[in-house]
Amino acid sequence: MKILLANPRGFCAGVDRAITIVKNALHKFGAPVYVRHEVVHNKYVVDELKAMGAIFVDELDEIPDGNTVIFSAHGVPKRVREEARKRGLQVFDATCPLVTKVHMEVHRASRKGQEVVLIGHKGHPEVEGTLGQYDENGTGMYLVEDANQVDSLPVQQPEKVSFVTQTTLSVDETRDIIDALREHFPAIQGPRKDDICYATQNRQDAVRALAPQVDVMLVVGSKNSSNSNRLRELAERLGTRAYLLDDASQLQDEWFTNVNSVGVTAGASAPEVLVQSVIDRLYQLGGSKLEQMDGVIEDTVFEVPVELRV
């Protein structure tokens, strides 16, 4: 059974930065360091940081006064920043800079009195953070999850509306919604540069190239990872049986009955050690040849805050 590895895969610059912020804060200040929400959506990473002394909370009221808090890579609503400021918490912001870019787009649009449509998945932390950037004196911001919802959007000023997208969606699913928005609101304005992040795009392109070449596609990533789910869905849309798994322990022997080739990739929040564990298990299940696919070389680096550089 041939094993083909997608490239690029795994950690992106935003995830790497967020994890480094937590680790460096623990090194500088000692445990505990509080983190609002999972800093990235990966069980292995979160468990590792917990073991080092990080405490993950849902809201700031779970954090005692005088402590350090880190905002996750997904970003937070303005009200959370204001609450932290009022309480005097020491804040380090691990929001991915590409998410911050979307936040600024929403902020600018609301200040201009524009209504804003956010393309994203309800309940995802990034979506909640982005919705929370809209000024209260603005006219309105709306979440849309599929093209069928566009006709029922309660937009009041169709000549003054813009759209933004969650950064971890697939290009395919946003394309249909954007087309519907442009048809329904001809004057709608979009971002100057696509909001889908470079790492999400690169990993999807790698799966798009690899999936048709294999019998089974494995995506290493956690169930609550948006970009990992999109990779699995993309492979399935291309006609390849695909599975999302946290680690090698979730591999099932029957997946590989009469399988001659298997593709492996990883979501942007999944560490390479988990990919390697999957490869090791595939060898035990009959894997005999490992091949690295060609792909985009990523050299983007996002700096951590000055106070946490070591």
UniProtKB/Swiss-Prot annotation:
Q: Which UniProt keywords apply?
A: 4Fe-4S, Iron, Iron-sulfur, Isoprene biosynthesis, Metal-binding, Oxidoreductase
Gene3D superfamilies, sorted:
3.40.50.11270, 4-hydroxy-3-methylbut-2-enyl diphosphate reductase, catalytic domain
* One Pfam family recorded for the sequence: LYTB
Residues binding dimethylallyl diphosphate:
H41, H74, H124, S225, S226, N227, S269
Q: Which residues are annotated as active site?
A: E126
Q: Which family does it belong to?
A: Belongs to the IspH family.
Q: Where does this protein hold (2E)-4-hydroxy-3-methylbut-2-enyl diphosphate?
A: H41, H74, H124, T167, S225, S226, N227, S269
Judged by the first EC level, this protein's enzyme class is oxidoreductase
**Record-annotated residues binding [4Fe-4S] cluster?**
C12, C96, C197
Lineage runs: Bacteria, Pseudomonadati, Pseudomonadota, Gammaproteobacteria, Aeromonadales
The residues the record assigns to binding isopentenyl diphosphate are: H41, H74, H124, S225, S226, N227, S269
| TM segment ranges | none
Please state the Enzyme Commission number of this protein: 1.17.7.4
Cofactor(s) needed: [4Fe-4S] cluster
Domain of life (superkingdom): Bacteria
One of the protein's GO biological processes:
isopentenyl diphosphate biosynthetic process, methylerythritol 4-phosphate pathway
- Reactions this protein catalyses: isopentenyl diphosphate + 2 oxidized [2Fe-2S]-[ferredoxin] + H2O = (2E)-4-hydroxy-3-methylbut-2-enyl diphosphate + 2 reduced [2Fe-2S]-[ferredoxin] + 2 H(+); dimethylallyl diphosphate + 2 oxidized [2Fe-2S]-[ferredoxin] + H2O = (2E)-4-hydroxy-3-methylbut-2-enyl diphosphate + 2 reduced [2Fe-2S]-[ferredoxin] + 2 H(+)
Query: What does it do?
Result: Catalyzes the conversion of 1-hydroxy-2-methyl-2-(E)-butenyl 4-diphosphate (HMBPP) into a mixture of isopentenyl diphosphate (IPP) and dimethylallyl diphosphate (DMAPP). Acts in the terminal step of the DOXP/MEP pathway for isoprenoid precursor biosynthesis.
| Protein name as it appears in the record | 4-hydroxy-3-methylbut-2-enyl diphosphate reductase
Q: In which pathway does it act?
A: Isoprenoid biosynthesis; dimethylallyl diphosphate biosynthesis; dimethylallyl diphosphate from (2E)-4-hydroxy-3-methylbutenyl diphosphate: step 1/1; Isoprenoid biosynthesis; isopentenyl diphosphate biosynthesis via DXP pathway; isopentenyl diphosphate from 1-deoxy-D-xylulose 5-phosphate: step 6/6
Q: Give an example GO molecular function.
A: 4 iron, 4 sulfur cluster binding
InterPro entries attached to this UniProt entry: LytB/IspH
Q: What is written in the cofactor note of this entry? A: Binds 1 [4Fe-4S] cluster per subunit.
